[in-house]
């Protein structure tokens, strides 16, 4: 079969890598992909003599540096026709069309990449784990929908990030952290999905069976962190990885929600949610339902490419 340009690692290559290990640890896979692609490498050694700068990426954001202005795109006639159709046919569904700001063409997706590299990447590393009331995006890229549907290719995105580092426009912890989400985590969960499906979808190691609360669909709850995540989700079809994992996901884990029900919710509400990426993140990282198949050495577990 033809290789998919939306990924660095073929399924055959991932199967070969997985056959060499009893524990499929993402960090080992990521280092191998760094060596294979040459990103942030000097020969066989990483820039800065360190593979992973996650420990430098957990600062709280208190108002400085200022947040970049959001990027907006003009709607073409196709956009307007589709928005009208959705409003007509699905007006009772969760979500809102009032703040639709996604690129729907490759040219606009490239503008979104450029905007992120210039305005947000320099601070992405420091604040990628931060949560701030009423600040929905912070310095996140919003590129995952374009990568997953093919409007952007991972190689051009990683090339742009690495070029920013070489031009001294963005620090190593930001560029490494961003590239790791694409070259490491995104490739890793895709490999896990295809290696273990279709049986993987039914895993429920903790035997959780509680129904998904209705407020996951309405957003109506007195729990402020949950309400903020729902507001962001329904306004933008987006939430960054800490909101998904540490807030809406952690609540599902602590209350024993059926993994299939929370998986269906994530798949329904996010613009970047395709089953190959959503399912391993939900079953493995959120619900611990996959018999501890997914292994990550970082103390903070995350959803890729926010």
Question: What are the residue ranges of the model-derived segments?
Answer:
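Beta-rich, aromatic/charged-enriched effector core domains that present basic-aromatic interfaces
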Residues: 1-102
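"Short basic amphipathic alpha-helical interaction patches in structured regions
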Residues: 15-16, 263-266
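Catalytic cores of enzymes that engage adenine nucleotides and/or redox cofactors via long glycine-rich
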Residues: 57-237, 253-254, 265-289
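Generic helix N-cap/helix-start motif at coil->alpha-helix transitions
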Residues: 241-242
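Alpha-helical support elements that line or immediately flank enzyme active sites
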Residues: 248-252
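Structural helix-adjacent loops and short alpha-helical linkers that scaffold large soluble proteins
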Residues: 256-260
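Single conserved hydrophobic/aromatic residue that forms the stacking wall/gate
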Residues: 294-305
């Amino acid at each position: 079969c033809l290789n998919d340009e939306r990924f660095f690692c073929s399924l055959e290559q991932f199967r070969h890598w997985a056959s060499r290990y009893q524990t499929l640890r993402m960090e080992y896979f990521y280092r191998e992909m760094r060596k294979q692609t040459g990103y942030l490498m000097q020969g066989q050694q990483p820039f800065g003599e360190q593979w992973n700068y996650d420990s430098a990426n957990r600062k709280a954001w208190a108002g400085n540096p200022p947040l970049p202005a959001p990027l907006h795109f003009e709607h073409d006639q196709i956009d307007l026709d589709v928005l009208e159709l959705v409003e007509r046919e699905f007006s009772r569904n969760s979500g809102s069309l009032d703040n639709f700001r996604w690129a729907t063409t490759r040219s606009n997706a490239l503008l979104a990449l450029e905007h992120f590299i210039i305005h947000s990447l320099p601070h992405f590393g420091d604040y990628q784990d931060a949560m701030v009331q009423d600040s929905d995006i912070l310095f996140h890229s919003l590129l995952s929908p374009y990568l997953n549907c093919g409007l952007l290719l991972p190689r051009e995105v990683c090339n742009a990030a690495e070029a920013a580092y070489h031009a001294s426009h963005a620090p190593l912890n930001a560029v490494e952290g961003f590239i790791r989400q694409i070259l490491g985590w995104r490739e890793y969960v895709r490999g896990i999905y295809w290696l273990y499906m279709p049986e993987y979808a039914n895993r429920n190691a903790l035997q959780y069976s509680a129904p998904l609360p209705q407020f996951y669909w309405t957003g109506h709850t007195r729990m402020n962190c949950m309400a903020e995540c729902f507001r962001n989700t329904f306004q933008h079809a987006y939430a960054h990885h800490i909101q998904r994992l540490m807030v809406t996901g952690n609540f599902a884990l602590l209350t024993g929600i059926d993994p299939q029900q929370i998986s269906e919710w994530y798949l329904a509400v996010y613009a970047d949610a395709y089953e190959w990426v959503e399912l391993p993140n939900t079953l493995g990282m959120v619900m611990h339902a996959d018999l501890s198949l997914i292994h990550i050495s970082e103390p903070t577990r995350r959803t890729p490419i926010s």
